[in-house]
Structure formats: structure tokens, C-alpha cells
Design a protein with these regions (language model features):
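Gram-negative/organellar outer-membrane beta-barrel architecture
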Residues: 1-145, 178, 208-212, 216-227
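C-terminal outer-membrane beta-barrel translocator/porin domains of Gram-negative envelope proteins
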Residues: 1, 101-266
Length: 266
């Protein structure tokens, strides 16, 4: 779960603490944002996180490996209009990899070239816009964001990624709304790094992606491991993401407080 306070101790600052666990992932994060760091609305934020992911523990076939990530960063947001802002960030992240029971050949080849432990420093620049009528459970308006992130000199690996996310809420009646959403991404290595780190690959599938499919179960398939040549190809991800969908949103029957729950057909 997570705890978020938008007016921490009456200061106007936002503090969030998240602790989530699943069968294959543990995620701990902390963030602090001063939304009015300057009088003209420039925001300043800090964050720290620890994430442990072990795909070996999933009950269905995905590429077998685990990665422990520890990092933190600082970001500055600058408003350019009432509905949009620019964001700039710097972060540091340490990743430690472990191979699993049936690690596929693509992973073993990357580890042979680059090793298992990496420390990377990243810079990011982004633009975001929102005209949503509310922050949660919106029923009209749109939001979108575009972010470019790249490792910088001093990093063990060299790669970048460009991500776009957008959604539109189109009311049909007072109770029924169509939601159109899409996520686009492109990532690539550069310089001395010969290929994109496999753990930076894009996947699809799952509740927040392509519903009806298991988490991270969609995407390019791997080469079977040499230790198990009869193994069927497993989802390995790729450096390009194109996904989208349409949902029909309407109030959940027999629920009095409609501000926290609603039904979605997809």
C-alpha cells in the first residue's frame, strides 16, 4: 500500500511513502515535493527507492532472472501554463543482477559482455499537460506526458529512452464515459554499450497494460537456454512499445460512494 499527504504538517509539501509486495516484486519508495519552491510555482522534489524483482517466482513462463535496484534522485518542475509544465531530473541507480534457473541466452550474452552489477547516473527532461476535472477517477479532460531519459558520463552503461503516455476522457452521459489511452516508448543503447540492457526492455500485458493477459507476458520471445534446449521461447521484451485501448467507465452498482470505485468495460 501507500500513504500520501498533500499538506504535510501544514507546510503545503507533499510526502508519499509506498510499500508494495507481490509474488515476484517488492517495492519501497519515498518522495517529497515542495510544489511552491519559488513564488512563481517552480517545484522541487526528492525521491528514494528500493526494488527487488525475481521473475523466477512467477507462476507462469517469463524470462528467468532477478534484479535488485537502489536509487534516488532530485527533480525540478517549471510551469509554462495553467495546465502544463516542464520537468528536469537527475538520478543515480545501482542494479545487481542474478541469473535464474533457466536464464535465456540473450541475458547470459549481455552479462558476459557487461557484468552483473551497474551504477548509472541519469538525466531526464519532460513535458506534461493535464486538463482532467479531478486527479482521481476523472470523467472528462485529457492528460499526456513526454519524457526523455538518458544515462550520462560516469555511468557503467550508456542508453536512453523516450516515453509518451496519454489518455482522453470523453463523457457520453452524466454516468457513462469513454476513456482512450495509449503508451508509446523507444529505447536504445549508445556509445560503448552494444545493446539495450535487457531489464530496460518494454513489456505488455496486465491490468495497467493489456487487460486479459498476465503481467509482462506479451512481447518478443527469447532463445531457449543451453541448459534446457527444449524450453519454449519466453517473453523477453523489446526496445519499442506501442499499446493502447478503450474503456467504458460507469458507476459501480449498489455502491453509495462513487468517488472511489467504478466499473470499466474493455
Amino acid at each position: 500500500g501507500s500513504i500520501s499527504q498533500s499538506n504535510f504538517l501544514g507546510t503545503g509539501n507533499k510526502v508519499s511513502l509506498g510499500l508494495t509486495r507481490s509474488d515476484y516484486q517488492s517495492n519501497y519508495n519515498f518522495s517529497f515535493v515542495d510544489p511552491y519552491w519559488t513564488v512563481d510555482g517552480v517545484s522541487l522534489g526528492y525521491n528514494a527507492f528500493y526494488r527487488a524483482t525475481d521473475y523466477d517466482k512467477l507462476d507462469y513462463d517469463v524470462s528467468s532472472y532477478s534484479v535488485d535496484s537502489l536509487g534516488g534522485g532530485v527533480n525540478v518542475g517549471y510551469p509554462i501554463s495553467e495546465t502544463s509544465r516542464l520537468n528536469f531530473g537527475l538520478s543515480a541507480q545501482q542494479d545487481k543482477l542474478k541469473t535464474g534457473s533457466y536464464t535465456v541466452e540473450e541475458i547470459m550474452e549481455f552479462i558476459d559482455k557487461e557484468g552483473k552489477n551497474y551504477t548509472n547516473f541519469k538525466a531526464s527532461a519532460g513535458w506534461s499537460e493535464s486538463t482532467l476535472n479531478r486527479g482521481l477517477m476523472a470523467t472528462r479532460g485529457h492528460s499526456q506526458s513526454l519524457v526523455l531519459e538518458s544515462t550520462i558520463p560516469g555511468s557503467d552503461l550508456s542508453f536512453y529512452r523516450l516515453d509518451y503516455s496519454g489518455q482522453i476522457f470523453a463523457p457520453l452521459t452524466s454516468n457513462y464515459t469513454l476513456r482512450f489511452h495509449t503508451d508509446l516508448g523507444y529505447a536504445e543503447s549508445y556509445g560503448s554499450t552494444s545493446e539495450l540492457p535487457f531489464y530496460e526492455n518494454y513489456y505488455a500485458g496486465g491490468f495497467n497494460s493489456v487487460r486479459g493477459f498476465k503481467d509482462s507476458s506479451l512481447g518478443p520471445r527469447s532463445t531457449p537456454s543451453k541448459s534446457d534446449p527444449d524450453q519454449k521461447p519466453l517473453p523477453f521484451g523489446g526496445n519499442v512499445l506501442i499499446q493502447g485501448g478503450v474503456e467504458l467507465l460507469f458507476p459501480m452498482p449498489f455502491v453509495k460512494d462513487q468517488r472511489s470505485l467504478r466499473t470499466a468495460l474493455f
